[in-house]
UniProtKB/Swiss-Prot annotation:
Cofactor note: Binds 1 zinc ion per subunit.
EC number(s) recorded for this UniProt protein: 6.1.1.3
Function according to Swiss-Prot or TrEMBL: Catalyzes the attachment of threonine to tRNA(Thr) in a two-step reaction: L-threonine is first activated by ATP to form Thr-AMP and then transferred to the acceptor end of tRNA(Thr). Also edits incorrectly charged L-seryl-tRNA(Thr).
Keyword Phosphoprotein annotated: no
Origin species: Shigella dysenteriae serotype 1 (strain Sd197)
UniProt keyword annotation of Zinc present: yes
Residues that bind Zn(2+): C334, H385, H511
Subunit annotation: Homodimer.
Cofactor requirements of the protein: Zn(2+)
Molecular function (Gene Ontology), one example: ATP binding
Localisation: Cytoplasm
Protein name: Threonine--tRNA ligase
Reaction catalysis annotation: tRNA(Thr) + L-threonine + ATP = L-threonyl-tRNA(Thr) + AMP + diphosphate + H(+)
């Protein structure tokens, strides 16, 4: 009979099989009431599942991350329960958990309106408030198939036929008259599923295949309590205000149009930000001793066949033909950099060789996945490739890590999650080589005092990698930086150097990206700063305004003076009230507004105001220039007097 060992090391002995709920009740009624599921020897199980052998057991509650995920999964079933009551002929497809919520794909003979979604959410609340028990049954494959066939659930039958072995025992979860199929676990009672909201609907092909029927996908969010739900909805509201597409239009940064899906038309102000970002990155490339190169926009398909990209990536590549040759528009820069490395004989003395490029790349992303600057088809990568010896890996990775944190800190990103992906089952190279490579990456992170977690088996077949995910002011995750070791591509493209022993050797290649793509990073920054770009990045840094026509010459004189000092400045001499001008430029998020009236002309000064409405008073023009230059030069995130 089972001996149950709890997380604190204490043990409980039973003379019969028990469930996690039984153990929770044995510990106390409060824990039993909070029990959602159990973790048995590291595996999540339902609260009702019986434990027959000695076991390590943790009780899962709504306070646990796993508990919240279970609540969300059960809310997907609740959605299914409600939709079948409202529209009984609906066919249910899949309803998984996603970040912050869940969705369900359904086959319904009507297009859901906003009123339908509201009615569906209302019915979900009515059902959840009944606090009914969720009943789990493990059945044979044949019984499960018969159950769903009798109910006309053709998608569930398809899942059983194509994805579940005949000797398996699927789990059926009964929500009163509604039944769903899942691996589980799920909540034991619907009292855990009171705090949710349906968010939106979208189209989704069955099994993600455009040859299949288009289903309707209903998205929802769910949380453990009302406070967490409201906080999330408030974050979404704030995110909507910060949406880079909305701000991009408001600030006239860029646009996109039907004739070039996923391609950016940069306007003057947006392109100014782009170029300033390039200047910043170039300054860091120089500091960290990189070469900057430029590869061709497209190359013969033969080269992409050699690299393996054609076999694995051709659906995402744009192609064109000329003179009976097929060319691929590059989706990435690395093969071109190997071609540059291969020009001329290289010695171990030439290594490490650090090669960077602002490469214009294109990928044929599905049209439905395109999203402003965040997901595009044409983009500029800020990546680089380092060619080095195995002995140099650790030092080079160290340099990459320092560069990543150096650049991210400039923008105020402080929360960065780091993951180290290790060898997959299918890989090239010896275990000894992988041992050393993984150790080099881990030691480099440790030497920089960077906490990280392993992603076992998640590395590429050609080498391990480090991923850097930054979190913005709304605590959203953005995976931007990577440091990837590559033991394959140099060999495929015949890259070599002469070693100390005068023998030809294949260099190790380190793929290094920090911003990811310039376009996406500008989108991230736009939302992070809500359009209030730090002065050094702002398209227009200063606007100088007159109150009446009599100050026009003075404004023009000052505008020229600031421009000569390297400050991006504009004059606003329109015949409008000064309050109107200030409001307009405040909405345009211009960092500084200098107001010139008769008093300023007489004194040779300016009245300084920030976009946040702070009056800095009357200041000498040279003092303003000096302070602005310092703020811009230091790439400060703060304005004067902040």
């Amino acid at each position: 009979m089972p001996v149950i060992t709890l997380p604190d090391g204490s043990q409980r002995h039973y003379d019969h099989a028990v469930s996690p709920m039984d153990v929770a009740l044995d510990i106390g009624p409060g824990l039993a009431k909070a029990c959602i599921a159990g973790r048995v020897n590291g595996e999540l199980v339902d609260a009702c599942d019986l434990i027959e052998n000695d076991t390590q057991l943790s009780i899962i509650t709504a306070k646990d991350e796993e508990g919240l995920e279970i609540i969300r999964h059960s809310c997907a079933h609740l959605l299914g329960h409600a939709i079948k009551q409202l529209w009984p002929h609906t066919k249910m497809a899949i309803g998984p958990v996603i970040d912050n919520g869940f969705y369900y794909d359904v086959d319904l003979d009507r297009t859901l309106t906003q009123e339908d979604v509201e009615a569906l959410e209302k019915r979900m609340h009515e059902l959840a408030e009944k606090n009914y028990d969720v009943i789990k049954k493990k059945v044979s494959w044949h019984e499960a198939r018969e159950t769903f066939a009798n109910r006309g659930e053709s998608y569930k039958v398809s899942i059983l036929d194509e994805n579940i072995a005949h000797d398996d025992k699927p789990g059926l979860y009964f929500h009163e008259e509604y039944v769903d199929m899942c691996r589980g676990p799920h909540v034991p009672n619907m009292r855990f599923c009171h705090h949710f909201k349906l968010m939106k609907t979208a189209g989704a092909y069955w099994r993600g295949d455009s040859n299949n029927k288009m289903l309707q996908r209903i998205y929802g969010t769910a949380w453990a309590d009302k406070k967490a739900l409201n906080a999330y909805l408030q974050r979404l509201e704030e995110a909507a205000k910060r949406d880079h597409r909305k701000i991009g239009k408001q600030l006239d940064l860029y646009h996109m149009q039907e004739e070039a899906p996923g391609m950016v038309f940069w306007h003057n102000d947006g392109w100014t930000i782009f170029r300033e970002l390039e200047v910043f990155v170039r300054s860091k490339l120089k500091e960290y001793q990189y070469q900057e190169v430029k590869g061709p926009f497209m190359m013969d398909r033969v080269l992409w066949e050699k690299t393996g990209h054609w076999d694995n990536y051709k659906d995402a590549m744009f192609t064109t033909s000329s003179e009976n040759r097929e060319y691929c528009i590059k989706p990435m820069n690395c093969p071109g950099h190997v071609q540059i490395f291969n020009q001329g004989l290289k010695s171990y003395r030439d290594l490490p060789l650090r090669m960077a490029e602002f490469g214009s790349c294109h990928r044929n992303e599905p049209s439905g996945s395109l999203h402003g600057l965040m997901r595009v088809r044409g983009f500029t990568q800020d990546d680089a490739h380092i060619f080095c010896t195995e002995e140099q890996i650790r030092d080079e990775v160290n340099g990459c890590i320092r560069l990543v944190y150096d650049m991210y800190s400039t923008f105020g990103f402080e929360k960065i999650v780091v993951k180290l992906s290790t060898r997959p089952e299918k890989r090239i190279g010896s275990d000894e080589m992988w041992d050393r490579a993984e150790a080099d990456l881990a030691v480099a992170l440790e030497e920089n005092n960077i906490p990280f977690e392993y992603q076992l088996g998640e590395g590429a077949f050609y080498g391990p990698k480090i991923e850097f995910t930054l979190y913005d002011c709304l605590d959203r995750a953005w995976q931007c930086g990577t440091v990837q070791l590559d033991f394959s591509l140099p060999s495929r493209l015949s890259a070599s150097y002469v070693g100390e022993d005068n023998e030809r050797k294949v260099p190790v290649m380190i793929h290094r990206a920090i911003l990811g793509s310039m376009e996406r990073f500008i989108g991230i920054l736009t939302e992070e700063f809500a359009g209030f770009f730090p002065t050094w990045l702002a398209p227009v840094q200063v606007v100088i305004m007159n109150i009446t026509d009599s100050q026009s010459d003075y404004v023009n004189e000052l505008t020229q003076k600031l421009s000569n000092a390297g400050i991006r400045v504009k004059a606003d001499l329109r015949n409008e009230k000064i309050g109107f001008k200030i409001r307009e430029h405040t909405l345009r998020r211009v960092p500084y507004m200098l107001v010139c009236g008769d008093k300023e002309v007489e004194s040779g000064k300016v009245a300084v105001r920030t976009r946040r409405g702070k009056e800095l008073g009357s200041m000498d023009v040279n003092e303003v220039i000096e302070k602005l230059q310092q703020e811009i030069r230091s790439r400060s995130l703060k304005q004067l007097e902040e």
